[in-house]
């Protein structure tokens, strides 16, 4: 079956290797599984607040309705397995701030099975690309330097031809669906 760009967005967090000016940072990644279009952001913390902040930014940049997201079971995305108020009946999910945000915005929040990162394979593969082609090739003088270089890397990635897209770039794929305006294609 043909995939459509608004169907599923995989979201994950990657530790930025090493330190930048003595600080640790976290890269949030959202990738559309149909178009491979990505949005990246770096924060100094990984928290529920940052997860929602990042999803809001993704929703703003994509300019189309995200139907569903898929995340791992980290406490920044769910408290299904970690909540202090966990019920003995695991069919009843405890409410997490991200789940509430998704519900308010009519977004389905899927969770991968515990210990099965391959179920979030599109975002995991993109993190490998980030490691090999971005982090191992760059150094960062400051948080601002990291942000600028990461934004450039994101623009490059979204304009890179992908075999899985029959040689199209993620931006070209989305333009064919007329889901984003050309002025928003670069980021």
Language-model-detected regions and their locations in the chain:
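C-terminal domain-tail junction helix/linker
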Residues: 6-7, 90, 105-107, 116, ...
């Amino acid at each position: 079956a043909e995939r459509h760009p608004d169907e599923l967005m995989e979201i994950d967090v990657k530790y930025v290797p090493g330190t930048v000016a003595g600080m640790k940072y976290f890269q949030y990644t959202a990738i559309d599984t149909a178009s491979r279009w990505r949005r990246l952001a770096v924060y100094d913390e990984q928290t529920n607040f940052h997860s929602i902040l990042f999803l809001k930014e993704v929703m703003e940049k994509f300019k189309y309705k995200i139907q569903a997201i898929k995340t791992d079971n980290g406490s920044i995305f769910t408290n299904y397995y970690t909540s202090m108020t966990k019920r003995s009946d695991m069919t009843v999910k405890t409410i997490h701030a991200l789940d509430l945000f998704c519900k308010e915005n009519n977004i389905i929040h899927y969770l991968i099975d515990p210990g099965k990162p391959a179920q979030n394979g599109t975002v995991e593969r993109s993190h490998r690309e980030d490691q090999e082609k971005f982090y191992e090739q760059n150094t960062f003088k400051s948080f601002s330097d990291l942000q600028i270089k990461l934004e450039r890397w994101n623009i490059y990635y979204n304009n890179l031809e992908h075999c899985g897209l029959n040689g199209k770039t993620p931006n070209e794929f989305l333009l064919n669906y007329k889901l984003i305006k050309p002025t928003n294609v670069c980021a």
